């Protein structure tokens, strides 16, 4: 039975595979039906729902199972906590840019080590996991076991969002990933910029600033930590949930 008072139809989406999850999203994300999921699993697929299908919100059924009776995060639920943290940090960007084509989603799939995308004036390569070199370029808080004598989380899948707000203004949120950014090649520059396996060899003079930060209540970006040196060059721009949002400003 149809009703003129029905605002929208919202699905429960418990599909575990990426294709099945996307099919449910596509079936309900229509111009005549605002897309909301009242029940779903809090995993990396939520980024696909928000970034590709303009999902207005997700409700994680059974969210109380994230914590132990003592209030500690259950290790097997850390990915859900991380995804919530990334989403909260990116909320102002999602509200501003959903439906504009400025949001790009990446989610690691089996046996796929990278993700590539052509943006406005730039090419981007996302490399999943830690860099395969003895030193990854990350700070002491985020390096993998074997290189720093501090406890580190076990391997986790990579996921997140890329926002190109303006041609030279980028925002990144996600987990277990690093990005390599370069101006798109022209016949004049193709000889001086080449992809070499897990890195990009090039001139980095187009990078103006790389900042970790967050958005305040007015939607303004606040810098918490400025990166420099090896953290912004050939080792890429790495992101993890606890750094919130990474902003990269470039120039011609």
Regions found by a protein language model. Name each.
Residues 2-3:
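Short, small-residue-biased leader/transition segments that mark boundaries at the very start
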Residues 7-11, 35-38, 57-60:
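Structural recognition of the beta-strand scaffold that forms the well-ordered cores
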Residues 20-27, 45-49:
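A short acidic, amphipathic alpha-helical/loop segment
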Residues 30-34:
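A short helix->loop->beta-strand "cap" motif at the edges of active sites that frequently abuts
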């Amino acid at each position: 039975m149809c009703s003129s008072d029905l605002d929208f139809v919202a699905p429960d989406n418990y599909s575990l595979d990426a294709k099945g999850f996307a099919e449910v999203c596509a079936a309900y994300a229509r111009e005549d039906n605002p897309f909301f999921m009242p029940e779903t699993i809090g995993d990396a697929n939520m980024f696909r729902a928000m970034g590709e299908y303009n999902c207005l919100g997700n409700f994680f059924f059974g969210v109380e199972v994230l914590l132990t009776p003592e209030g500690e995060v259950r290790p097997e639920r850390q990915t859900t906590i991380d995804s919530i943290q990334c989403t909260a940090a990116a909320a102002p960007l999602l509200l501003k840019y959903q439906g504009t084509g400025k949001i790009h989603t990446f989610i690691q799939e089996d046996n796929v080590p990278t993700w590539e995308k052509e943006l406005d004036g730039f090419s981007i390569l996302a490399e999943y996991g830690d860099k395969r070199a003895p030193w990854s370029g990350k700070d002491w808080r985020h390096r993998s076991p074997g290189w720093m004598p501090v406890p580190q989380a076990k391997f986790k899948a990579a996921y997140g969002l890329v926002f190109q707000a303006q041609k030279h203004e980028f925002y990144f949120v996600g987990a277990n990933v690093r990005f390599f950014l370069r101006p798109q090649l022209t016949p004049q520059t193709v000889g001086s910029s080449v992809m070499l396996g897990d890195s990009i060899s090039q001139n980095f003079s187009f990078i103006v600033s790389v900042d970790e930060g967050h958005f305040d209540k007015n939607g303004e970006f606040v810098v918490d930590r400025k990166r420099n040196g090896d953290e912004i060059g050939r080792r890429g721009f790495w992101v993890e949930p606890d750094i919130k949002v990474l902003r990269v400003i470039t120039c011609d």
